[in-house]
Design a protein with these regions (language model features):
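Serine-esterase "nucleophile elbow" of acetyl-processing enzymes
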Residues: 29-87
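Catalytic His-Asp segment of secreted/periplasmic serine-dependent ester chemistry enzymes
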Residues: 176-255
């Protein structure tokens, strides 16, 4: 009987002790759901297919953009970013509207919707072959081709938007670089005709609420560096990296500036007039440039040294006449976001 009584007392004490805890307990808050699978759909021609890069499925611009999206969205809880690249080398706007690429894109969008995925981005690189097939044509033929493009390119964008339905995907179209690097203001020149087609692309994008990665002005002056021209018309690895950067900026997902810290020199008197400038600059997606400015004037780009994990340079102030200076370091990331840091220094022997 004593044992029974003791057991009852222990049970009563435990129940009494736990009662206040139960009274104070609150319902569990459900964990916020992660982002669904993010889908990136790449459409277009041989540029979008990554043709003539060293590794098309690694260095082609859609794969580079996918990698950037993955860095960005996985940090927000997305399980993955899936790239579906339907680009067809040789595709024109006319063949796009009538061929398999658009049909397959529609099926991809429906499949994503059915499995609960989100088509987050669509890139469209179309029109290059519409331009190329008119090479060597007379003015009347080129005008007829341009008039047709004014119908087919907007129709292609409208078909993509219709397929997306209520899915709020971001559409980015790319313009085309001018291999001649001529004067686009010179009516009738190759550069002028390329500019006319690019203007159709820009205007059509505006009408459909799409964004523009404006390749042409950025490639101007860099054709031999960023393409295989004159042996081939396609962009090389460096060119695709530049297109990817422009697309990433146009998408506008990354609004976070990099972090910048000046490690050397410290504020105050300098030990010599050729100080080493050492900077840490970090970004979740990537830093593209770190500049040194002195009293607001650009001096040089600092160079990243992997073994140091820092950006380094030397400021040559031997001819600097003022007793002091403000050193500003400005870092830019892939999305174009910028951040800066400053340090005030006094020069010796002033």
């Amino acid at each position: 009987m004593r044992r029974t009584r003791s057991a009852l007392m222990v049970a009563l004490l435990i129940a009494t002790a736990l009662a206040p805890l139960a009274a104070r307990s609150t319902p569990r808050v459900a964990a916020q759901p992660a982002l669904p699978e993010q889908v990136y759909l790449a459409l277009g021609d041989s540029i979008a297919a990554g043709l003539v890069t060293s590794l098309p499925r690694v260095r082609g611009y859609p794969w580079l953009v996918r990698d950037l999206m993955e860095k960005h969205f996985t940090s927000e809880g997305a399980p993955a970013v899936t790239l579906i690249n339907r680009a067809v080398p040789g595709e024109t706007t006319t063949s796009f509207l009538a061929g398999d690429q658009l049909r397959e894109a529609r099926a991809d969008i429906e499949a994503a919707r059915a499995r609960g995925a989100e088509v987050r981005a669509v890139t469209v690189t179309l029109g290059g072959n519409d331009i190329l097939r008119l090479a060597g044509s007379d003015e009347a033929e080129r005008q007829a081709g341009l008039d047709q493009f004014r119908t087919t390119f907007p129709a292609a964008l409208a078909a993509i938007r219709e397929a997306l339905g209520e899915m709020p995907a971001d559409i980015v179209v790319t313009t085309y670089y001018d291999l001649s690097e001529g004067n686009p203001a010179e009516q009738g020149s190759d550069a002028w005709w390329v500019a006319q087609f690019n203007e159709v692309i820009r205007q059509s994008a505006a009408a459909e609420g799409a964004r523009v990665a404006d390749v042409e002005p950025v490639f101007r002056g860099n054709i031999r560096e960023w393409t295989w021209y004159p042996s081939d018309i396609h962009a090389n690895n460096a060119g695709h990296a530049e297109i990817a950067r422009l697309v990433w900026q146009a998408l506008g997902y990354d609004q976070e500036p990099p972090t910048v810290t000046i490690e050397r020199p410290a504020a105050g008197p300098l030990g010599r007039r050729t100080p080493t400038v050492r900077v840490r600059a970090d970004d979740a997606v990537g830093v593209t440039r770190v500049e040194l400015l002195v009293d607001g004037t650009y001096v040089q780009d600092l160079r990243y040294i992997p073994s140091q994990g820092a950006y380094l340079g030397v400021w040559d102030a031997r001819d600097w006449s003022d007793a002091s200076a403000t050193l500003t370091v400005r870092a830019t990331d892939l999305a174009g976001n910028q951040a800066s840091a400053e340090v005030e220094v006094a020069l010796p022997g002033s």
